[in-house]
From Swiss-Prot:
Protein source organism: Bordetella parapertussis (strain 12822 / ATCC BAA-587 / NCTC 13253)
Keyword Cell inner membrane among UniProt keywords: yes
GO molecular function, one term: fluoride channel activity
Organism lineage string: Bacteria, Pseudomonadati, Pseudomonadota, Betaproteobacteria, Burkholderiales
Record-linked InterPro entries: FluC
Keyword set, alphabetical order: Cell inner membrane, Cell membrane, Ion channel, Ion transport, Membrane, Metal-binding, Sodium, Transmembrane, Transmembrane helix, Transport
Residues annotated as binding Na(+): G77, T80
Pfam families cross-referenced by the UniProt entry: CRCB (PF02537)
Activity regulation, short description: Na(+) is not transported, but it plays an essential structural role and its presence is essential for fluoride channel function.
UniProt function note: Fluoride-specific ion channel. Important for reducing fluoride concentration in the cell, thus reducing its toxicity.
Cellular compartment(s): Cell inner membrane
Gene Ontology cellular-component annotations: plasma membrane
The protein's name in its UniProt record: Fluoride-specific ion channel FluC
Residues that span the membrane, as ranges: 2-22, 37-57, 65-85, 101-121
Enzymatic reactions: fluoride(in) = fluoride(out)
Length: 126
């Protein structure tokens, strides 16, 4: 059972800060007016890494809760971003680029699910 221990709060906070910074950099470098490659990249990489962490945590029940909280809830929660994805999709819809919005939404959702599943399956089959 998780508790509201100070170490858990610190783990989430540090992880979230690092994840958000890492999400910000590809957004600066890769996001363009037509397609937000930086956000898509962050979400796909984050989805894959969440799968990795789910498999690693499942195979190491002795790990303390703060490790999962720092890595998954904090870092990967800060790296991946449903709110930015949603805002970018709505912006595309408002600009009338419906096919681009649909493609971006589909690529983000299907890609993130595929990356998470790929990582989880690969590690669990070891």
């Amino acid at each position: 059972m998780l508790t509201f221990a100070p170490l858990n709060f610190l783990a989430i906070g540090v992880g979230a800060t690092l994840g958000a910074w890492l999400r910000w950099v590809p957004g600066l470098r890769l996001n363009g007016a037509g397609w937000p490659w930086g956000t898509l990249t962050a979400n796909l990489v984050g989805g894959y890494l969440i799968g990795v962490m789910v498999a690693l945590i499942a195979s190491h029940p002795e790990w303390p809760a703060w490790i999962r909280l720092a890595a998954v809830t904090g870092f990967l929660g800060g790296l991946t971003t449903f709110s930015t994805f949603s805002a970018e999709t709505v912006d595309m819809l408002e600009r009338g680029v419906y096919a681009t919005a649909a493609a971006y939404a589909g690529a983000s959702l299907a890609g993130s699910l595929a990356m998470t599943g790929l990582a989880t399956v690969r590690l669990l089959l070891r």
